[in-house]
Amino acid sequence: MLLSSFGVAFADGDAANLFKTHCQGCHGADGGRVPASGIEPIKGQSDADLLKKLEGYKDGSFGAQRKLVMENVVKQLSDEQLKSLADYASTL
């Protein structure tokens, strides 16, 4: 159980770093920026909605303009990282 607690704390920090590294450039530090593609901002979306979209970009079932940009980003991330990222981004 102790390791589990540390894992959660690490995941939170890791998710913030993932967001900063992979998302902030287009979506802004607070997730409120509308990217050039005109899609809705991340800010204010639920973790479930964000995860569904991230998984859709990864498997090719979601996306419109700039789809290739997002596909290239999420292909680098594990399913666990996508979940952590969605959880973190939903708090913005």
Would you name each region that the model predicts?
Residues 2-19, 33-34, 38:
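Electrostatic cytochrome c docking/interface patches
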Residues 16, 28-59, 71-72:
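Gly/Gly-Pro-rich "capping" loops immediately C-terminal to redox-active cysteine motifs
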Residues 11, 29, 67:
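Residue-level hotspots at or immediately adjacent to binding/recognition sites across diverse folds
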Residues 23-29, 85:
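The canonical Cys-X-X-Cys-His
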Residues 62-65:
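Conserved donor-nucleotide binding/catalytic region of nucleotide-linked donor-dependent transferases
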